[in-house]
């Protein structure tokens, strides 16, 4: 059984930060669950371009507000506490923080290794178990 508290993740190598977000990776590939599980904070008033070409993601908002815009068709969906969205088609999108930080619970398949951040195209690279880029 795996039991972890968020306080054990904050400030460690399993907490990854970028200009517009912080992600606390609670389950990783090394845990061999077949997915990774993250708590991600999207900062208020920010916009992040994301295009997961190598991963599928499901997201559940537990606090805060914001919106997601799909680039292909320009549709905008509000996000608030209780909203779930799934990027089942590797949807390229903008994720925007609203008036307050948005706290999201995220599941990725395949599981991330840990240090992944979005590249210039909004993509998480595929990494091997040592953190080296495969794709």
Label the predicted regions.
Residues 48-50, 68-69, 87, 92-99:
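Short beta-strand His + acidic residue motifs that chelate non-heme Fe in jelly-roll/DSBH
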Residues 31-33, 73, 100-101:
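Short strand-connecting beta-turns/loops that link adjacent beta-strands
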Residues 1-35, 117-135:
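A short, N-terminal "cap"/entry segment at the start of jelly-roll beta-barrel domains
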């Amino acid at each position: 059984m795996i039991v972890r508290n968020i306080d054990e993740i904050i400030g460690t190598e399993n907490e990854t930060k970028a200009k517009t977000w912080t992600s606390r990776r609670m389950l990783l590939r090394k845990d061999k669950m077949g997915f990774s599980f993250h708590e991600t904070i999207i900062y208020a008033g920010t916009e992040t371009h994301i295009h997961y070409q190598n991963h599928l993601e499901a997201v559940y908002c537990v606090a805060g507000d914001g919106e997601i815009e799909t680039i292909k068709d320009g549709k905008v969906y509000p996000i608030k506490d209780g909203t779930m969205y799934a990027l089942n088609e590797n949807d390229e999108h903008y994720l925007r923080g609203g008036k307050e930080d948005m706290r999201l619970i995220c599941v990725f398949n395949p599981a991330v290794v840990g240090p992944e951040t979005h590249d210039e195209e909004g993509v998480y690279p595929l990494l091997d178990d040592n953190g080296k880029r495969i794709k």
